Amino acid sequence: VRRAELLDRHFPRRSELDFARTVIERGLGLDLTAEGRIHLDLEPHQGREIGVRAEAVRVPDEVHVVGRPLGGVGDAEALLGALGRALAAAHTDRTLDLELRMLGDEAVSAAFEVLFAGILHERSFGERRFGADRELYFERASLLDVIRLRGIAARVPIESDPEGIPADARVAGAASAALGLPIEAPVAWLELDPDRGASTCLRGFALAAVLRQELRSTFGVNWFESRRAGRYLRDIWSYGRRYDAEELAREVGANGLRWDLVREDLVGSSA
């Protein structure tokens, strides 16, 4: 399901960067590299892990997007997500104190990653991109989001365990119960991301849903093709981590994080 080989023809190998450039520069009117502050290193070096991630070294002046994309829809989503995170860091107001540029609430950065990776999930975008395969794509996207959210939710009691690192049996049991499938311990451990806590990931999803609704209501369902939306995002990114996820949600007009919007997005993707 993650690899989605049947959809590969829509994203030939080595086409991910051109696709991302089209979305970010032609659609939103943003510079992919943020005037050189974002450094791209996507060459297939030996030993480099598969996938793409963003790493902020000096915010906002040095942000790296690194990895080894193999092609296909999954890597296209991952690259867009990494660039969403990178653009947020690279547009942070440099006059902010260090703790407001690089520390603070990680859920805010996670939200921009989820928001950009989810551009392909937008109905109007996906229908044009995938054509006759659009329903296959939307079903896959919705299923993966459900799997991911349930897997993250399963980590909450594990990470709050006062006894420390849980045993294999407990990890496997929690993952299996969340997904409704028998998950062996080695696979379950892969889902435990030591750099991002479960609550951070969940709050990132919720903030992304709030931002997505605001973008749609202000700039239309094709917000990802609006340069005004790009300027709006740039203004929000300038805040850095001045606000936590709940505060930023209120700053853009919501009454805090909206979990109902997360559910609506899941239902909408599969509608």
Identify the role of each PLM range:
Residues V1-V73, E251, R263:
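Contiguous, non-catalytic segments that form substrate-binding/exosite surfaces or channel walls
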